[in-house]
Amino acid sequence: MPERLLLCTDLDRTLIPNGPQPESPGAREIFAALVKDTRVVLAYVTGRHRQLVEEAVEQYGLPQPDFVIGDVGTTIYRIERSGNWRLDTSWDKQIGSDWNDMSNRDLQGLLSDIGTLRLQETHKQNSRKLSYYHALGSDRGAISSAIETRLQSQGIKARLV
């Protein structure tokens, strides 16, 4: 059996432009040639949700990955040769265990009285990702500390990003 090479890369400002920085000339072409090797297993690791990953692949002509770790690490997909995306449910269960089997909604209730938090849009959430905005000028450190304390008091293992 030939050796395999797992190649994991971010998308934004790594493979594709995002913001004012220009894209590196020829980078996508070189990358595409590299991942054509059948020994390469390609994974995109991104904060993007599935739809945004699919849009980026289409818009920039990126190679179809074998895996996507998306939504800031809260989802893992295996992409089949047919193009079907298969959610890794064992990863969801692992996070669920870390959350003491509490749901996204349960955590929303748990954090509802903390500072100036405002829930982000529905498309920026998933069953294991809870995203908020906080008011400009608010004490981000104090808010983060309050969230961490509240989660820890419930035995919830989570990381604030």
Indicate where each model-derived feature is located:
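Short, surface-exposed acidic/glycine-rich loop or hinge patches that mediate macromolecular interfaces
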Residues: 21, 47, 137-138
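Asp-based phosphoryl-transfer active-site loop
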Residues: 2-21
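Conserved acidic, metal-coordinating active-site core of Asp-based
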Residues: 105-161
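Charged helix-capping and loop-helix junction motifs
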Residues: 24-27, 144-146
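Conserved strand-to-helix beginnings and helix N-cap segments that scaffold or border functional pockets
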Residues: 20-21, 54, 141-144
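Short loop/turn segments at strand-loop or loop-helix junctions that form parts
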Residues: 7-12, 71-73, 124
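A general structural motif
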Residues: 2-4, 39, 65, 127
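Active-site phosphate-binding/coordination module
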Residues: 26-122
